[in-house]
């Protein structure tokens, strides 16, 4: 015998499957779903226990329906016979509505049941239709005050006291109340398997589940929307039983129940009211009604159609005009590469450097995948998040009708700072009352070995020259001195720039930071290449120049010659009618140095307005930066405006941090740095690049975010530069470059400016098209283990400029075979790298003739073939060398080899001039007497 399933037991017990599942769970039997099987012992226990708990909901109680409680003796009046109801007038057909305090369950007395059967009581088959027409007026005003017994299988049962505020709202006050007879003849639960009602409670309209939109076609559901909703005893939405008339059709003699303005189900008062009438019919309007019914319309209090189409017009049909216009524009958009993209009308779009297709798609409101397809259609392959260069964006913009502009790094950085409420332009516009005088910033420029550092030593009374490697300056030095001008102490900030040609960037940086430039020219050398370069830097920065003609005490000095040479570059002395001040000095002897300082201050007072606001946040530039072993990152900064304090959060390029300490050029601690003051700052997280502007951020968090966003921007820009459009010609060029031998170099230096200068000088070395230099890494600080590992993988050479590794790193480099070269003077490093490049060139060979031998006799051997008896005319014949045959001065055979060389019967390695020998040319036997055997070899020549 098959096991019973849960839904079968529910049908047998007359309850729903959910109730059975809950009961099984209470019994300790956990089943999964209604389709699960149940064991026979559990079935018996369920059937034995269920009538106690579920019988009240599934089986009616005849005793309760026939025996009223003692609290309602007047409740038997509404149980009048239908005949009396039919013969009465509308005003007197039924007693008045019960008062609030009466029970809603008006069961008849014991004798009322027989009386109703004798007076044409409708049969059980007609009970549902009668109840649908007469039960509605009895409904109370509150939704929860249902008539008793309607939830219990249609039988009348006592309910708690429910006051009926508002009386009978249906408009048929004379309709009889439902009696006990209607509940007496209801079918037993579970007898009819095809009935919708299997002993379960009759659901009220609020409990009836909405049908699925696809379950059946749309019907007239006014009984759910209008007055048919919420009335007890009404079975709106259920099909009538067989043998039963239409649910809204009145019985003979009962037309008085259907008043004007009320539907067959006793709808809301007033037939012309929205939603009134047709409470009892399902598919057609059988009852009279004054007002037209709105089939499918939502009545007052009805739901918005959560499960069907009863809720009125669908929200999907209510598309706004903007959405329709957007769809129309998309349909009008041209198809490019198989996708539709709305083209622009030449509008300008600004993108950052290193932007991707996703950034562009966000600007023009399209799908990034569509832009990838269009770019692929144009012959370019890129992902949505890949950084692209400006040329690629321009090609794409021309195709889709947009003018794409890549913003510069300065504009992008300005927009970044504005996000943190930092506006550099507005801070430059200071009020006159806030501006105070500041010292001038003077840069000393000129050719190498013309005495720039010696001049500063004389001014500062120091000896920096003695501490410099090679006697040349290789970094920018910043100093501040106090001079006496007409009894007044004045401060001057000096920047000492290198004069070597490798430090062009440093000189340009010094010219941008300075107020006045001192051009030092040696009286014996005159104008030199770096002198001209310094003049160009100063003039491009619009900086006034004071010329110091140095070394006037050296024999052969000619200051007038220097003045004449400088007039060619626009520097005309005042004595010649110009505006440039010339001072003849001797830095070594200290001659006229005070006059030079006086000229600098006069120029500053006459031509410049040197004022700044010391009360604002500090702004300035990074002059130099290095990595100190004990202090970490140390940056030499020049404060241009504001005051820098200890504890300020600063950002310098991609580096950030908090000022932990400040030192002057002499190593003394400072608490604050005023405008035009050079100071060494400690506390940065990394070494900034020389020339980066620094500023004070509101807090540490803002400083870190600014630095990180700058790092991301630089990284994206670098990735965009690496990706370039490769045409066929460029591909051939790249393929040719792949055959070039590259010298990989790792550069480590003591300061960022020195590393920058060394890298720039090395990249300018040009030896040949066959070799090149590639700097795979550069950094500031000592040589570390990571540098050695990187050089080992890429077979690179490490150059340490004024830095050295520790013992462990040196041992690792020796084990890995990594070469480390140490330099303290930049031009020595350049010379060695240039020599290394020349050594990497492929060797070139030239042919050198070594001897001539004349054949005078031919010996024939069955084992060795023909053997030539020769006389060595010149040079030296060696065994294994290349040879050729000359017959009558014409080369007849080439690429021969002397395989055997004998003198008499002995094998020899070589035979010199004037001796006879026997020569065997291997398998070659076509020789004649009188031929000349010429030997030669390929010798390597030096590449220059």
Swiss-Prot record:
Entry function? One of the essential components for the initiation of protein synthesis. Protects formylmethionyl-tRNA from spontaneous hydrolysis and promotes its binding to the 30S ribosomal subunits. Also involved in the hydrolysis of GTP during the formation of the 70S ribosomal complex.
Cited SUPFAM superfamilies: Initiation factor IF2/eIF5b, domain 3, P-loop containing nucleoside triphosphate hydrolases, Translation proteins
Entry's Pfam families? EF-G_D2 (PF22042), GTP_EFTU (PF00009), GTP_EFTU_D2 (PF03144), IF-2 (PF11987), IF2_N (PF04760)
Entry's Gene Ontology molecular function annotations: GTP binding; GTPase activity; translation initiation factor activity
- Gene that produces this protein: infB
Q: What is the source species?
A: Bifidobacterium animalis subsp. lactis (strain AD011)
List where Low complexity composition bias occurs: 63-101, 281-292
- Could you list this entry's UniProt keywords, alphabetically sorted: Cytoplasm, GTP-binding, Initiation factor, Nucleotide-binding, Protein biosynthesis
- Protein name in UniProt: Translation initiation factor IF-2
Stretches the record annotates as Disordered: 48-326
Please tell me one Gene Ontology term that the record gives under cellular component.
cytosol
Q: Does the keyword Cytoplasm apply?
A: yes
Region of interest (G3), ranges: 496-499
Q: Which residues form the tr-type G domain?
A: 437-609
């Amino acid at each position: 015998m098959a096991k019973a399933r849960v839904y079968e037991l529910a049908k047998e017990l007359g309850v729903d499957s959910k109730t059975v599942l809950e009961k099984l769970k209470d019994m300790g039997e956990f089943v999964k779903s209604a389709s699960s099987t149940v064991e026979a012992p559990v079935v018996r226990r369920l059937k034995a226990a269920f009538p106690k708990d579920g019988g009240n909901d599934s089986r009616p109680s005849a005793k309760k329906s026939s025996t009223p409680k003692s609290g309602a003796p007047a409740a038997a009046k509404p149980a009048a016979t239908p005949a009396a109801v039919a013969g009465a007038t509308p005003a007197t057909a039924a007693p008045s509505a019960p008062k609030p305090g009466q029970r809603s369950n008006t069961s008849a007395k014991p004798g009322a049941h027989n009386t109703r059967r004798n007076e044409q009581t409708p049969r059980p088959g007609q009970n549902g239709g009668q109840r649908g027409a007469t039960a509605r007026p009895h409904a109370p005003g509150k939704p929860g005050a249902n008539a008793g017994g309607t939830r219990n299988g249609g039988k009348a049962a006592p309910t708690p006291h429910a006051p009926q505020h508002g009386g009978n709202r249906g408009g048929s006050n004379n309709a009889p109340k439902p009696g006990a007879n209607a509940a007496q003849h209801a079918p037993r639960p579970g007898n009819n398997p095809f009935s919708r009602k299997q002993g379960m409670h009759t659901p009220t309209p609020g409990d009836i589940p909405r049908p699925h939109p696809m379950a059946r076609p749309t019907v007239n559901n006014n009984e759910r929307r209008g007055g048919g909703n919420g009335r007890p005893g009404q079975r709106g939405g259920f099909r009538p039983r067989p043998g039963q008339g239409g649910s809204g059709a009145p019985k003979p003699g009962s037309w008085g129940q259907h008043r004007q303005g009320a539907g067959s189900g006793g709808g809301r008062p007033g037939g012309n009211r929205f939603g009134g009438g047709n409470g009892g019919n399902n598919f057609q309007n059988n009852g009279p009604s004054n007002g037209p019914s709105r089939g499918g319309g939502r009545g007052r209090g009805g739901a918005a159609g959560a499960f069907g189409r009863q809720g009125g017009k669908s929200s999907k049909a209510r598309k706004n005009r903007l959405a329709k216009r957007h769809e129309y524009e998309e349909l009008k958009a041209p198809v490019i590469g198989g996708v539709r993209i709305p083209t622009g009308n030449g509008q300008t779009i600004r993108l950052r450097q290193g932007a991707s297709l996703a950034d562009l798609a966000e600007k023009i409101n399209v799908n990034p995948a569509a832009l990838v397809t269009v770019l692929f259609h144009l012959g370019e392959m890129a992902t949505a998040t890949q950084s692209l260069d400006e040329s690629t964006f321009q090609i794409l913009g021309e195709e889709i009708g947009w003018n794409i502009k890549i913003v510069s790094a300065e504009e992008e950085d300005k927009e970044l700072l504005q996000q943190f409420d930092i506006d550099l332009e507005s801070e430059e516009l200071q009020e006159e009352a806030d501006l105070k005088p500041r010292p001038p910033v003077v840069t000393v420029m000129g050719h190498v070995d013309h005495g720039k550092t010696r001049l500063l030593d004389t001014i500062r009374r120091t000896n920096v020259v003695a501490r410099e490697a090679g006697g040349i300056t290789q970094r920018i030095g910043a100093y501040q001195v106090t001079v006496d001008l007409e009894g007044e102490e004045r401060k001057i900030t000096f920047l000492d720039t290198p004069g070597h040609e490798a430090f062009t960037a440093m000189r340009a940086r010094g010219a941008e930071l300075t107020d006045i430039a001192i051009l030092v020219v040696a009286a014996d050398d005159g104008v030199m290449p770096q002198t001209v370069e310094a003049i160009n830097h100063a003039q491009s920065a619009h900086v006034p120049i004071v010329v110091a003609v140095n070394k006037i005490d050296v024999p052969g000095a000619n200051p007038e010659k220097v003045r004449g040479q400088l007039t060619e570059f626009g520097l005309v002395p005042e004595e010649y009618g110009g505006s440039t001040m010339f001072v003849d000095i001797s830095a070594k002897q200290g001659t006229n140095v005070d006059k030079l300082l006086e000229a600098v201050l006069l120029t500053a007072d006459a031509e410049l307005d040197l004022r700044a606001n010391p009360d604002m946040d500090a702004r300035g530039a990074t002059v130099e930066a290095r990595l100190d072993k004990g202090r970490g990152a140390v940056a030499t900064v020049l404060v241009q405006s504001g005051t820098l304090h200890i504890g300020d959060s600063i950002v310098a390029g991609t580096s950030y941090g908090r000022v932990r300490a400040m030192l002057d050029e002499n190593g003394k601690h400072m608490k604050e740095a005023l405008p035009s003051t050079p100071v060494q700052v400690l506390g940065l997280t990394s070494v900034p690049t020389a020339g980066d502007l620094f500023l004070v951020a509101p807090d540490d968090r803002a400083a870190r975010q600014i630095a990180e966003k700058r790092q991301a921007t630089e990284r994206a820009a670098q990735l965009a530069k690496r990706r370039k459009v490769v045409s066929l010609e460029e591909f051939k060029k790249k393929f040719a470059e792949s055959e070039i031998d590259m010298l990989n170099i790792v550069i480590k230096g003591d300061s960022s400016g020195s590393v920058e200068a060394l890298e720039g000088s090395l990249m300018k070395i040009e030896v040949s098209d066959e070799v090149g230099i590639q700097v795979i890494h550069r950094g500031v600080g000592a040589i570390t283990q990571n540098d050695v590992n990187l050089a080992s993988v890429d077979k690179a050479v490490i150059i340490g400029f004024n830095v050295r590794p520790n013992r462990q790193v040196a041992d690792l480099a020796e084990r890995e075979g990594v070469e480390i070269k140490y330099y303290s003077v930049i031009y020595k490093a350049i010379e060695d790298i240039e020599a290394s490049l020349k050594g990497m060139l492929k060797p070139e060979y030239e042919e050198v003739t070594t001897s001539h031998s004349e054949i005078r006799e031919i010996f024939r051997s069955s084992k060795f073939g023909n053997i030539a008896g020769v006389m060595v005319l010149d040079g030296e014949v060696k065994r294994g060398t290349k040879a050729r045959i000359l017959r009558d001065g014409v080369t007849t055979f080439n690429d021969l080899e002397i395989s055997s060389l004998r003198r008499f019967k002995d094998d020899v390695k070589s035979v010199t001039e004037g001796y006879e020998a026997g020569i065997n040319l291997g398998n070659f036997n076509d020789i004649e007497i009188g031929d000349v055997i010429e030997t030669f070899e390929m010798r390597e020549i030096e590449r220059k």
